[in-house]
């Protein structure tokens, strides 16, 4: 099912504990560096399949930046904070700063990938960080089942063109390199 723009949310982390007695929460952040999650407010917090909005009153990195704690408006004691453990934290796409050029990785998810020969390779389902180069996981349903292709994200070598507006990526890659899942 496709979601409308208004339904799109960007998951930035999760509340994974409580900190102190005044309602502070521990955060597992997906941002890099981890404390960048504190740059965004308000947060959308998913509580029992419903998104609630919270202003971030304060926040800081702990343990040399390895963890993050935050104080959210309206959560003023340890017992109330405990109710939010396990809840996802998200923001709306318009809260992201505009990129001067380029794009955010999350904008590549769902893009249709075609080879220079015009062959449909499938859709980007994931971006895998490998250390050397990030890798696009592209999946396509075929008669033999789900075909998964890993394509190194190396501009001008394998990735020839990215158009996030039309959700299209052109690559110099062939399906013979694919593996079935």
UniProtKB/Swiss-Prot annotation:
GO cellular component, one term: ribosome
Disulfide-bond pairs as recorded: none
The organism's place on the tree of life at top rank: Bacteria
Gene3D superfamilies xref list: PRC-barrel domain (2.30.30.240), RimM (2.40.30.60)
Annotated GO biological process: ribosomal small subunit biogenesis; rRNA processing
Entry keyword annotation includes Chaperone: yes
Keyword Kinase: no
Keywords: Chaperone, Cytoplasm, Ribosome biogenesis, rRNA processing
Subcellular location: Cytoplasm
MF term (GO), any: ribosome binding
Domain PRC barrel: 100-177
Subunit text: Binds ribosomal protein uS19.
Protein task: An accessory protein needed during the final step in the assembly of 30S ribosomal subunit, possibly for assembly of the head region. Essential for efficient processing of 16S rRNA. May be needed both before and after RbfA during the maturation of 16S rRNA. It has affinity for free ribosomal 30S subunits but not for 70S ribosomes.
Comment block on domains: The PRC barrel domain binds ribosomal protein uS19.
UniProt name for this protein: Ribosome maturation factor RimM
Organism: Hydrogenovibrio crunogenus (strain DSM 25203 / XCL-2) (Thiomicrospira crunogena)
Organism ancestry: Bacteria, Pseudomonadati, Pseudomonadota, Gammaproteobacteria, Thiotrichales
